[in-house]
Each structure stands twice: as C-alpha cells, then as structure tokens.
Amino acid sequence: MNKFLLFFMSVLVCATAKALDFTVDGVNYQLISSEEQTCKVVSGNYSGAVVIPATVNYGGRDLKVIEMADQTLCNTYDVTSVVLGSNLKKIGKNCLVNLKIETLTIPGSVTEIGDYSLSLSKLKKLVIEPSGEEDNPTAISIGIFEETVNYTKYKRPITQRLKSLESLELYRDLSCNKSGLFQELPLQSVIIGGDAAVKSEMFYECVNLHSLEFTDDATFGHFGRGIGSEAFYHCPLEGEITFPAAIQGFGDRCFSGNHFSAIHFENTTGFSIGAGAFSRSENITSLIIPEAVTMIGRNAFSSCKNLKNLRIETNGELKEAALCGNDYDVVTFTANCTQNMIAASLAGEISSGNTIVDFSPAKIKDLHVNAPVPPKQFVDFHGKTWGFTEDQYVLTTLYVPAGSLEAYKSAEVWKNFWNIKADPSAGIEDVEADAEAEEGPVKWYNLNGQLIDNPTTKGIYIKHVNNKSTKVIVP
C-alpha cells in the first residue's frame, strides 16, 4: 500500500510540474514562469511567414516571449520568413536551421545564440540590432559548430554557416570563443555601428567585400576600441574611407590588401597602427599620417605600389621597415618629427647590410626632413647605426630647412646623401586657403619645393610672403 501511494504521488508531482503548452496564431509556446509571466517558443510544423511576437496573450495575460527552445525552426524547410520579437533573449541550440529565408534581423534584446544554430544557406542579409541596454550594452554570446575537413574536426563560430551572406549590418558586440566570425563569407557590404567591436580575423579573406561603412555612433566595443588583427585581411575594400575618432588602434595586418583609394583618420587624441596594418594598399596615391599616431608598426604601409606622396606629421614611434617597399615621389617628415628610426623605416637595413624586412627598401625621389636639428638615427647594441641604403643615398634628393643645411651636411647618416638642398617649405605654419593675405610679393611652391603659378586645383601649397612661408590648403 505504501509503495502504491508513493508511486501515485510521484506521478501526480510530475504531472503538476509538466510545463504548460499552448498554441496561438499557429505558433507553439511553453510557459516558463507564471509568476514572471514569461514563455518560450517551441518546435512545430511551421511554414510560410513565421512571426514570433514580443508578447502573446494567453489566459487573459500578456506573456513575454523571451526564448526559442532548442530545435525551434529546425529543418522546417517551408518557412520563407521569420520575425523575432523584441523581448527575445535566448535562441537555443539548433534553432533557425535549414529555412528558406533570405533576410533576418536579430533584435537588441538577444544575449545568446546557441550551438549549431543559424544554418541558413540562403540567407543574404543579416541585421544585428543595437543592444536594448543603452547605458550598459551587452554582447551576444555566439555558439559554435563542428565540421570535419580532410578527416580533421574543427570548431568554428556558427556565423560561418551563412554561406550565402552578402550584406551585414552590425550594431552589437559579438562574443565567441572562436575567432573569424564571418571569415571567408561572400559578403559584399558591411556596416559597423553602435558598440560592435571589430575583432581579430572577423572578416578574414572575404574576397567579395568591397564596401565598408562606419556609422556616426560607432564606439567599437568596450575593450580595445580598435580594429583587430587581420580583421579585414585581403578584403578588396574600395573607395575613400575616413576612420572614426573612436578607433584607438589598428591591429596587425588588419587592412592588408585593401583597394581603398584614400585613407583619412579622425582621431586627434592618440592611436597606433600595427605591423602590416595597411600593407599592400595598392590604390592609394597620397597619405597623411597625423600627429595623433603614437606608433607605426613594422611594414605598416609597405608595398603600397601607387603611393607617391607621403607626409608624416607624428613624432610617434616608428618601427623598422614601416614605410618600405614603395616607390615615392615625395616623402615629408614635419618639423616635430625627430624620430631615430626615420632611416630604418624607409631602408629596413642596418649599416652592415643585413636585411630585417619583408619588403624591399623604398625608392624615394625627394625626401623632406623639416626638423631644425638633424635627427640622430638608431644605434644598435653592436654600435652600428641604422642608416639608409646606398641607392637611397645616391638617388634621393634630401631637402632640409635652409638654416640647417650645413648641419645636415655634417651630421651622421644625413651627410651621406649626395644631393642635399634647402627646402623652402620647411618650418612653415598651417593656414586655411581663405586666410587674410599679407602685403608683398607672393611666391607659390608645391610640396616638392618647385615654384608654380597661383594654385588653381585642390591640394596643399606653400605661400612665401615677406620672408615667411605658410602652408595653404586649397579645398
């Protein structure tokens, strides 16, 4: 009798504990908490357009839909579109698998997407909305999947399963214990905004990716606030790009192999440029590295085959071979640049001739060094000075401030140049093109120091009036 009573009570408890299932408008739900009035969507025989609402009315109560149970919308091949509600927090394992949908928006409320989800071979556009917590935005935890390649198993982010993805709008930070979130996908355009962080290898070798845009509110996440190493490695990004002030660093090789036509930096408070960050930027023809740069890494701008005019306005740290592998018309170091690695950044060789670079030394027609005092160049622990190459000494014309000409002609390293000339543009001040003109004869020079007529095209020119030179920017 006691055994029978015990069995009966256990069955009663199980029946009482069983979650309440219900269906509204063709969507199956399961109650999570009657007290908190929450529920989750569960699997079912779905087809066509599926809408998961923010709330669902059941028993006269509006229940928040906060979860998709494991295997919801899994292998429901006839589903053509999915709308996810604004209260959804968790997308379980094996959800959103093998659907016919071409677009998907992940709402800002979602904090977790489980393993083996998002197997959407036809998805072309993905939008990940900003976090619903504006004051303290949280990242979305991204699950992984396992695949076997040549008998070897690899664990990868589930986002790599989106094999037809062409467009991504990312306004949220994504967290995953595997790198390469969108690696090697057929993406064509990417928009980055909100607190989305651009992490290492995130878009590695997306060889169809031509368009990249940053929104005005982009903060690049809470940690690092930069572009991760190899984030856009070998992505043929095109057009003129301005990097927002929020970016505090560019990781190693992050934009190596891009097709940008022009690069601009808005940060005025300090940022670093990692090794090879913009190497093989084949379409840029001129570049200004602003004063805010704190470090230019090894090979950072190497092998930019069409880069002809380079202006370095920073006295930040220069690494060896940072500017190698290019064929320059003009390279200018402004008056504040007294770095001891100027030679090493362009030559990449020490005085003994032992190479330390991945690219060939730069070819330079005209080198402008505007520091009033010749910068002393690096001496290694062997006592050897890192100088320029023999070809650079012979073939490059060195322009220096007129008042410092004799000092350069007698200074270590600099005295080895065969052609050293006074630079009429050295030591000038910056003014706008519409600044009030001074009285007296006016002479105009280009940045090569050549006398010209009044400038009529867009660019930077040198105006010489009453023994005073100023830089004029013609917009």
Predicted regions and their residues:
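Sec/Tat signal peptide C-region and signal peptidase I cleavage site
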Residues: 15-19
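Structural signature of tandem-repeat unit edges
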Residues: 24-26, 45-66, 77-90, 99-112, ...
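Short, surface-exposed loop/turn motifs with a glycine/proline- and acidic-biased composition
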Residues: 58, 446-467
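Sec-dependent N-terminal signal peptides
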Residues: 4-13
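Residue-level detector of functionally pivotal "anchor" positions at catalytic/ligand-binding pockets or at interdomain
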Residues: 423-448
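A recurrent domain-boundary module in secreted/ectodomain proteins
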Residues: 410-427
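C-terminal tail/sorting-segment detector
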Residues: 1-3, 462-475
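Consensus positions within tandem repeat domains that build extended binding/scaffold surfaces
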Residues: 71-72, 92-95, 114-117, 143-144, ...
